[in-house]
């Protein structure tokens, strides 16, 4: 029946083609056919690349525009000024001290070196030991530092690359992984490795799933789907490993992953779905149960990025705060990344990547069987790894104990809720979403929030400016009363709201440093005083360095913004050429 329906159309098509080619010689027909097929394949590949045709078109247009001499000179002139600004900042922070650019002929003494280190560590404008910094340093205690110094002294030259020589360090790493897996309700088959930080943990997870999908499902063009609020380490993994990263929007009121958007983005090449607990920009938690359900429905692994708040969320229930399920207790969650060097309070350079089953971890490993030097295998990016850092991480966890972590979590979350509540009471401010753990994203509808960040910097505070809010709509507290704590009335109706200001944000990442010595009260008081001053002229625009940061978000040619960033990174390695 079906074939008879298409038969007349096919006959017409056949007659048409035969008529067009009736006067062609066989070699011409073969040439036309081959050329048409090759052109079709090329056109398909050109249109359906990892990067959209529109995005590539914009980049090409901007790249060609930058080749116009007048435009190129103007852009290069401005970039040179920015580069010079970054270098001057580094020079100023160095406080006029000379650089060591060649190895000294005679080595310096122990005393000289220690004094130099003390001098170097005094550079900088922010008193992080007194809690003036958002994130960065999550715990500081002289007794713990003494313990870690002793431990690192003992293990400083150890390397788990040589398990026969340093089996004790390998045992410590295995114990860190198992302790962490148990905290995240991993079963007997759960496993993992330590890494040097959250970025490497995420890189390893992406590499593992890429190789797993290639081996088990034959996927050659892998894609990972994640909310736009996910950490840029996933984008780095995409660049490193040739994985297409598909960003999906978040709910513009609660700032959680839009599950329907993630569902629509799934394709036959999807190898991983990602959720955060919490995300960095807003401090809100994605609905891991819903993401995991999506993963089960389509047989796609699910990664939970708990790098930022992992060592808070696992203790929050015991600290008296209920959270939705987010770990291996949720069916469908196949991996979790968590930083021990953040709220695990270990020294910098340690994180953990966990898997629900060894089959995923096996694809994280790199194995070379035909090297003349022998069979080579390494669990993470690095071959040699610092055994001293592994030992220090192990010592931190064993020293704190469960009770210590629960107590620290309770203090941090209590402080976060206090700051959140008090900031909502300030005329002209609002909070994005509902902070799940320790991150508070602050905005204003009546003045540019970067002005507050700049003002607080003059008082010694260091906050994080953020960019690109989700969606075109701005938070409306009256339509989302659940975002406002009980008894707190938003005061935004008392002032003129200026469209666009609510799209800018800064955030405070509360650490253990903010729970002591009245730090939270000092922060709130400084915010109240500076907002009162700003409200005298709320329409004034931001200036200084933050103005440049804000301006960069409006530049359509993102390659120029990339140049800004590269110059900033270059400045970190500045040394004088005339010394």
Language-model segment annotations:
Residues 2-170, 174-178, 182-183, 406, ...:
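Non-catalytic terminal extensions of PLP-dependent enzymes
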Residues 24-27, 168-169, 192-199, 226-228:
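Active-site nucleophile and cofactor-binding loops and adjacent substrate-binding regions
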Residues 173-178, 190-219, 232-237:
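Conserved beta-loop-alpha segment that forms the PLP phosphate-binding cup at the N-terminus of a helix
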Residues 214-269:
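PLP-dependent aminotransferase-like
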Residues 241, 297-298, 459:
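Helix C-cap/helix->beta junction micro-motif
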Residues 257-306:
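Active-site phosphate-binding strand-loop segment of PLP-dependent enzymes
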Residues 307-311, 320-330, 355-375, 453-478, ...:
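Flexible glycine/proline-rich, aromatic-decorated loop/lid segments
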Residues 315-438, 442-448:
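Active-site C-terminal subdomain of aminotransferase-like
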């Amino acid at each position: 029946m079906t074939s008879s329906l298409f038969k007349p159309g096919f006959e017409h098509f056949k007659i048409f083609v035969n008529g067009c080619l009736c006067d062609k010689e066989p070699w011409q027909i073969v040439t036309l056919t081959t050329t048409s097929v090759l052109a079709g394949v090329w056109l398909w590949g050109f249109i359906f690349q990892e990067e959209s045709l529109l995005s590539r078109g914009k980049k090409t247009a901007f790249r060609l525009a930058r080749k116009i001499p007048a435009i190129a000179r103007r852009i290069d002139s401005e970039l040179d000024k920015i580069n010079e600004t970054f270098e001057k900042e580094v020079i100023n922070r160095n406080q006029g001290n000379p650089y060591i650019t060649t190895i000294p002929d005679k080595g310096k003494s122990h005393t000289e070196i220690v004094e130099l280190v003390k001098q170097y560590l005094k550079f900088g404008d922010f008193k992080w030991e007194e809690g003036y910094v958002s994130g960065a340093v999550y715990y500081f205690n002289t007794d713990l530092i003494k313990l870690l110094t002793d431990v690192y002294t003992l293990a400083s030259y150890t390397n788990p690359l040589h398990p026969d020589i340093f089996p004790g360090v390998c045992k410590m790493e295995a114990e860190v992984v198992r302790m962490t897996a148990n905290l995240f309700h991993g079963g007997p088959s759960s496993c993992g490795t330590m890494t040097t930080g959250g970025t490497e943990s995420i890189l390893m997870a992406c590499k593992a799933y890429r190789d797993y999908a290639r081996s088990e499902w034959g996927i050659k063009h892998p894609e990972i789907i994640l909310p736009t609020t996910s950490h840029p380490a996933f984008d780095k993994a995409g660049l490193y490993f040739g994985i297409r990263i598909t960003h999906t929007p978040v709910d513009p009121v609660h700032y959680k992953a839009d599950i329907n958007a993630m569902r629509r983005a799934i394709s036959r090449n999807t190898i991983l779905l990602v959720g955060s607990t919490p995300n960095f920009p807003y401090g809100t938690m994605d609905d891991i149960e819903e993401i995991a359900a999506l993963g089960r429905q389509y047989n796609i692994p699910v990664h939970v990025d708990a790098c930022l708040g992992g060592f808070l969320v696992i203790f929050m229930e015991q600290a008296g705060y209920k959270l939705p399920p987010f770990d291996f207790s949720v069916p469908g969650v196949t991996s979790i990344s968590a930083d021990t060097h953040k709220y695990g309070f270990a020294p910098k350079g340690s994180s953990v990547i966990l898997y629900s089953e060894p089959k995923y971890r096996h694809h994280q490993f790199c194995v070379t069987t035909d090297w003349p030097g022998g069979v080579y295998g390494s669990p993470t990016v690095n071959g040699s790894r610092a055994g001293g850092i592994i030992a220090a991480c192990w010592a931190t966890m064993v020293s704190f104990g469960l009770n210590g972590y629960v107590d620290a979590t309770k203090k941090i979350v209590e402080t976060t809720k206090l700051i959140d509540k008090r900031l909502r009471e300030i005329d002209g401010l609002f909070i994005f979403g509902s902070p799940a753990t320790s991150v508070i994203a602050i905005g204003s509808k009546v003045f540019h929030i970067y002005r507050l960040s700049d003002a607080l910097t003059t008082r010694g505070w260091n906050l994080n400016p953020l960019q690109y809010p989700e969606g075109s709509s701005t938070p409306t507290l009256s339509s989302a009363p659940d975002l406002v704590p009980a008894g707190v009335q938003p005061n935004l109706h008392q002032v003129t709201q200026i469209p666009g200001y609510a799209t800018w944000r800064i955030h405070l990442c509360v650490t253990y440093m903010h729970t002591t010595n009245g730090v939270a009260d000092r922060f709130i008081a400084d915010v109240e005083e500076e907002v009162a001053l700003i409200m005298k002229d709320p329409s004034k625009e931001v200036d200084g360095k933050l103005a440049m940061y804000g301006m960069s978000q409006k530049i359509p040619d993102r390659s120029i913004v990339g140049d800004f960033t590269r110059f900033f990174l270059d400045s970190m390695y500045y040394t004088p050429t005339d010394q």
